[in-house]
Amino acid sequence: MSAIPDVQSTPDTRNIVIQRVGVKGVRYPITVKTSSGVQPSVGSWNMYVRLTEEQKGTHMSRFIALLEENNQPLDVAVFGALMRKMLVLLDADAGRIEVSFPYFINKTAPVSGVQSLMDYEVGLTGEMKNGELEVTLKVLVPVTSLCPCSKKISAYGAHNQRSHITVHAVLNGDLVVEELIAKIEEQASCELYGLLKRPDEKYVTERAYDNPKFVEDLVRDVAGMLNKDERVLAYTLEAENFESIHNHSAYALIERDKRLS
C-alpha cells in the first residue's frame, strides 16, 4: 500500500508569514480549579500558532489532540503549560490560546441565608511572543449600581440598575477566580444573588441606597483594588451601567500597565 500524501507538509513558495492559523470556536468540556476543589464547565476554545513563510500548512488535528490529552483542572499555571505544549506539538515559535466558559459560585443570601448559584463569564488568554508567555484572566461581574445624583435630588429613592464590570488582568501569579470576583463585587453599590427572600430584598435595596456609585466611581474603586494586587501586572477595566432611566448605557474604562511605571 502506498503512503498517503501529506500535502500540508509540503513547502510554500509565496514567502508570506501567517501570524495566526488554527482552530476557532471549539466547544470542549473542561474542569476549572476553584478555591474549594474543581468545577466542571464547557469551554469555547480558539487556538492559533504562527506559520513561517516556508510552511504550507499547520497541523490542524494536533490542536484537538492537545485538548484530548489535557486532563488537569485549569488554572493559570496549567493554562500556561498547555500553551507551551501547543507550541512544541505544532513546531511553532509563537501562538495564542483563548478559552471562555461559564463559572458558577454558590452564594448565600445576606439575611435569610438561602443558597443559590450565580453565574459569571470567565476567560483565559495566553500568548507567546519572542519567547515570553503572557496570561490574561478575564471576568465579567454583574453588579448593582445606584446613582448618587438621583439619591441627592430625589425625595423618594434613587434610580438604580444592573451594571457589568469587566476586568482583563495580566497575571504574574495564580489568582483564584472567586477571589477576584469577590473583590470586584465589594466595590459596587451592591452585589447580585441568584435567589433572594423578602428580607434579603430589603437588605440589598438599602445596601445599594447607602452605597451610591457613578460609573466613574465603579472603575476608580476597582482600579484602586487592582493597583494594590502584586499578582496583577497590567489590566483593562470597563464598567457599563444599563441605565434604568435612559435608553443608553453609561460607560467608563481604565487601563494601566504597572510594568511601565
Swiss-Prot record:
Key word GTP-binding present: no
Gene3D superfamilies associated with the record: Urate Oxidase
Keywords: Hydrolase
Catalytic activity: GTP + H2O = 7,8-dihydroneopterin 3'-triphosphate + formate + H(+)
Superkingdom of origin organism: Bacteria
Swiss-Prot/TrEMBL GO biological process terms: tetrahydrofolate biosynthetic process
Pfam families per UniProt: GCHY-1 (PF02649)
A GO term for molecular function: GTP cyclohydrolase I activity
Record-annotated site: May be catalytically important: 147
EC number, as in UniProt: 3.5.4.16
Pathway(s) annotated for this protein in UniProt: Cofactor biosynthesis; 7,8-dihydroneopterin triphosphate biosynthesis; 7,8-dihydroneopterin triphosphate from GTP: step 1/1
HAMAP family to which the protein is assigned, alphabetical: GTP_cyclohydrol_B
Biological role: Converts GTP to 7,8-dihydroneopterin triphosphate.
Family statement: Belongs to the GTP cyclohydrolase IV family.
Name of the protein this chain belongs to: GTP cyclohydrolase FolE2
Species: Herminiimonas arsenicoxydans
Gene it is expressed from: folE2
